[in-house]
Amino acid sequence: MALVLQGCGQPAQEQQAPADNEQRISAAYGSWVSPLGAAEVYGSASAIGELQSVGDAIYFSESSPAEGGKVGIKRLEKDGSITSVVAPAFGIGSRVHEYGGGDFLGIGQSLFVTKGQDQLFYRIAPNQEALALTPNGTRHGECISYPKGSRIICVREDHRQPGEPKASLVTINLNFSGEGDIFVDGHDFISSPAINADNTQLAWITWEHPNMPWDNTQLWLGDLNRKGQLTNIRQIAPERKGALMQPLFSPNGVLYFIADYDNWWNLYRLDAKGDIEQVTQLKAEIGGPAWKLGQHAYAFENENTLIASFNKEGDAGLLRLDLQTGVIEVLAADFADIKQVVQGADGVYFVGSRPTPERGIYKVSGRGTELVYAPKICGLDPRYISRAVNVEFTTKGGDKAHGYFYPPVNGDYQPLPDTRPPLLMMLHGGPTASANRAYDSAIQYWTSRGFAVFELNYRGSTGFGRQYRQSLYGNWGKADVEDAVWAAGFLVDQGWVNAEKLAIRGGSAGGLSVLSALAFHDKFKAGVSYFGISDIEVLGKETHKFESRYLDQLIGPYPEMKAVYRERSPLYHLQGFNEPLLLLQGLEDKVVPPSQSQHIYKALKDKGVPTAFIGIEGEGHGFRQPHNKILALESELVFYGMVFDFTPAGTLPALKLDNAAALARPRQQAKLPE
């Protein structure tokens, strides 16, 4: 007997799994019965967000499926006990830059948090009502303690005036509501405040349009006088260009930071003369793109050593660095993802994920690396788990691209003779993001049903150095799509997948790649777009401040290159778009507005292409509520069954596919929008 479901919020069910020498059920790929349902994938699995050391405890944020994905705060004591401090119903979550981060700060017995619903910044203290400290129309995040005058320093985004919101560093009084005092302003974006141990120096990061924080940023340093005023403000090494991030003072007051001066994000420090000294020379990345505030890729154990996470081509590890000798000791290299590295009272803590279901909060101490808290996760018996195969392939022009291949695995089934599995080509968003090989129930949902999955790290992904990351600049909607097409061809040539059952799916920027692949190429036979981009020109006019000039890098300056924007927009090139498409869209999306999906849906529907649109009320950019995630995943399965002619197992929602009768019939030309 095998326990096929573990930690899914319900008792595991015993199911007889055949031994290797027993007869397995022969069935079509895609129709296999899986022990992992969509409700198990999204209905009970929680996710850890940020860590922070407060006194002898570690505070961490965690989402709650039972509360519709809302986020609360828990406390991890040294003895391993867990206490809920802020209930998920409160719903913490900053929306600075829309993506948020840096949602809470602990000081003594009090917590200071941003509430997701109203974006006010609250003080939560024992036996007291929550007190809002900030005015309406402002958003705060990434706060740090500043003992002078009982204040804290926060990143603020001010939305109270027309036009773009204003960025600043402000001080907030901990005891009463008020406007707060501006410490630093005058820049398009500000992040990452850090203060030294004796509260005499403050460091921070800024960047200006059209840069993103992974392009070119500036590191600043200022002195704090006895009155708490910021003086002697200077930029560190203004002559050197790079993406600098995560400044942090060592216990003895030396300023460290991460920069990609040598193509890779490595550690640097400011020496006694004020010169920059490179501390690590890894051909790997310490840290990642700052989509959110409050990221921590390293922490100091003491004055002599630090612990840092690193990423190499999608795999993650942990190292200890001797600050005097420069000697590096690799503590772990078997992780798929590591984030939120913080110094606690009894060791360094971090959030880690592995290729196996084991994930959670880990501690590094004299006893080694140990898992100290694991949230609920839907684990599977190994007989149902697909393991990633690291793939490097040659793409158009002879360049190399990367990805992870997951073959179909189900201990109860075998495929029909002489068949190959359908492929789901999965594209991450960003496009400055990356796929890794962390155990993901959403991937196992597909592989345990008989699908092959390929997670593509197309040119532009992180984890491969600055040059690879910027190879997409000027080529977005082209190079990423070419990589997907060439990856599919590689997998077909290897005999791993069925050439007639190739599907491509992605969200946001990945959704653009999906639509472009179907509009400009004929490799894929179906596509699924989650809040994808169909009109790049309109996106640049409608999106929020943080990404409003991102397209200057990805495409080129507008309106000078207006023609290229239209050339790359799938909405205007539907003549060759003939394959079925499913569109899923949050109707409150502020990053990629619903019109991006609605317009291409109407054009394809009018053309006669089999097309479905699911607009979801109450959801923004990325679905948060478990029941909506479940609906999307199950609808996607139904869609593939209709397109690839198999019957999925289980009770699934009905899907209205317009022009379903035309699945095998030539389509007519679409009407272009006026």
Model-identified regions with their sequence ranges:
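Active-site-proximal cap/loop segments of hydrolase catalytic domains
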Residues: 458-674
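C-terminal motif of bacterial Sec signal peptides marking the signal peptidase cleavage site
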Residues: 6-7
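Short loop/turn segments that connect beta-strands within beta-propeller blades
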Residues: 77-80, 125-128, 173-177, 224-227, ...
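Conserved beta-propeller blade repeats
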Residues: 43-57, 91-109, 137-152, 185-203, ...
